């Protein structure tokens, strides 16, 4: 399992990308508004898992991870906020409850990323 983790991780990203593309092209995000929630959760989880995968592979990243700017939680929050700004600038149709939708996206993404963080941090940073 450990040997094939990179392939599993790549496959998970590929699956999420295919699913996201299908859901976007089919306008399913706008028909089933709840689809946004598992996508934000899974992408944040995969993002943090990918960070730890490369952290475990590269010794130099372990020192870098100790610097506040490269703290994985800080990076996660920065990427989640950047994604929301990206969606806004792309012209994603704004619903009447855009603020609540954005807040939910941020919280769900943070939960997904933190779940991965707490699972992998003791196995990677503490080594």
Predicted segments, located by residue:
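Bulky hydrophobic segments
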Residues: 1-127
């Amino acid at each position: 399992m450990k040997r094939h983790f990179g392939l599993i991780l790549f496959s998970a990203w590929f699956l999420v990308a295919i699913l996201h593309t299908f859901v976007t092209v089919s306008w399913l995000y706008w028909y089933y508004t709840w689809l946004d929630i598992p996508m934000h959760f899974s992408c944040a989880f995969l993002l943090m898992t990918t960070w730890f995968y490369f952290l475990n592979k590269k010794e130099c990243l372990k020192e870098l991870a100790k610097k506040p700017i490269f703290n994985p939680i800080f990076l996660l929050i920065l990427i989640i906020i950047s994604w929301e700004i990206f969606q806004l600038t792309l012209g994603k149709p704004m619903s009447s409850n855009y603020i609540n939708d954005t807040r939910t996206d941020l919280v769900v993404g943070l939960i997904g990323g933190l779940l991965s963080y707490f699972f992998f941090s003791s196995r990677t940073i503490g080594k």
